[in-house]
Swiss-Prot record:
The gene is Nup35. InterPro entries: Nucleoporin_NUP53, Nucleotide-bd_a/b_plait_sf, RBD_domain_sf, RRM_NUP35_dom. Keywords: Membrane, mRNA transport, Nuclear pore complex, Nucleus, Phosphoprotein, Protein transport, Translocation, Transport. It is a peripheral membrane protein. The modification Phosphoserine is found at residues 53, 55, 66, 73, 99-100, 121, 137, 251, 258, 278, 283. SUPFAM superfamilies: RNA-binding domain, RBD. This is Nucleoporin NUP35. It comes from Rattus norvegicus (Rat). Functions as a component of the nuclear pore complex (NPC). NPC components, collectively referred to as nucleoporins (NUPs), can play the role of both NPC structural components and of docking or interaction partners for transiently associated nuclear transport factors. May play a role in the association of MAD1 with the NPC.
């Protein structure tokens, strides 16, 4: 019986080391299952899987940012580890290029400088010939002024002012009125005839100005004070001293040769005061004084007729006192 008691224990003792040395059999009999350990939650953060955790997001970032604390360059195996795993989830963020010295900081300045140089170099090449040859060239700047004239340069004040010198003496009795339409020239001339005696005026054929010569400088200054005045509620008139020497010289020659033409016909038709130089035209018209005398001669009072007068006798006074007449 003792032999039978020892025999069954022997194989158990011999089989126990075989079970311990076998890598495929589980440790306890109750927990023996056919599922891997990581699916059952048996992963207590072992030490051996740390080298393989480079592909993890948290450990990978730690591996990449570790050179910042160490102050050295990142290890070379880290860079190809992310390129090989194309099907795996992303290991680093899109902003890691800026924070990582090995991957982002060092190439960024070089790439930015390259981009700036590439972007700016064609701009400089394009703008330099344009600004240097076409825009700021003295020859090109002077060409448009020679070929085309601006509206200000077509103004007679611009062309006449260039011909004046410091030695020229202008007649202060001449003024230039401008800013009115051609249809209102007679109306404007009539308005300026109120400021003084107009000896002569020269109307522009195509422009909107005319030169007026007054009898005295004081009258010309009075006309100059009307610069910017509005006539007829729709016409603003400008008045400036006349600077056209040709008009002044022609006027002086005309007065010396034929003084009767000193006053032009438009002024006579507007009813301005007549001058001695206009006597040939006035002689054909009946004077106003003669017309006045002819119209009032039939209505003069005749001295022979007796006009009724009030009776101032004593009887009439007594009757007026008594009866209240």
């Amino acid at each position: 019986m003792a032999a039978f008691a020892v025999d069954p224990q022997a194989p158990t003792l011999g089989s126990e080391p075989m079970m311990l040395g076998s890598p495929t059999s589980p440790k306890p009999g109750a927990n023996a299952q056919f599922l891997p350990g990581f699916l059952m939650g048996d992963l207590p953060a072992p030490v051996t899987p740390q080298p393989r955790s480079i592909s993890g997001p948290s450990v990978g970032v730690m591996e990449m940012r570790s050179p910042l604390l160490a102050g050295g360059s990142p290890p070379q195996p880290v860079v190809p580890a992310h390129k090989d795993k194309s099907g795996a989830p992303p290991v680093r963020s899109i902003y890691d290029d800026i924070s990582s010295p090995g991957l982002g900081s060092t190439p960024l300045p070089s790439r930015r400088q390259a981009n700036i140089s590439v972007l700016q170099s064609p701009l400089v090449g394009v703008t330099t010939p344009v600004t240097g040859q076409s825009m700021f060239s003295p020859a090109n700047i002077g060409q448009p002024r020679k070929t085309t004239l601006s509206p200000a340069q077509l103004d007679p004040f611009y062309t006449q002012g260039d011909s004046l010198t410091s030695e020229d003496h202008l007649d202060d009795t001449w003024v230039t009125v401008f800013g009115f339409p051609q249809a209102s020239a007679s109306y404007i001339l009539l308005q300026f005839a109120q400021y003084g005696n107009i000896l002569k005026h020269v109307m522009s054929n195509t422009g909107n100005w005319m030169h007026i010569r007054y009898q005295s400088k004081l009258q010309a200054r009075k006309a100059l004070s009307k610069d910017g005045r509005i006539f007829g509620e729709s016409i603003m008139i400008g008045v400036k001293p006349c600077i056209d020497k040709n008009v002044m010289e022609n006027s002086d020659r005309g007065v010396l040769s034929s003084p009767s033409l000193a006053f032009t016909p438009p002024i006579r038709t507007l009813g301005t005061p007549t001058q001695p130089g206009s006597t040939p035209r006035v002689s054909t018209m009946r004077p106003l004084a003669t017309a006045y005398k002819a119209s009032t001669s039939d209505y003069q009072v005749i001295s022979d007729r007796q006009t009724p007068k009030k009776d101032e006798s004593l009887v009439s006074r007594a009757m007026e006192y008594m009866f209240g007449w």
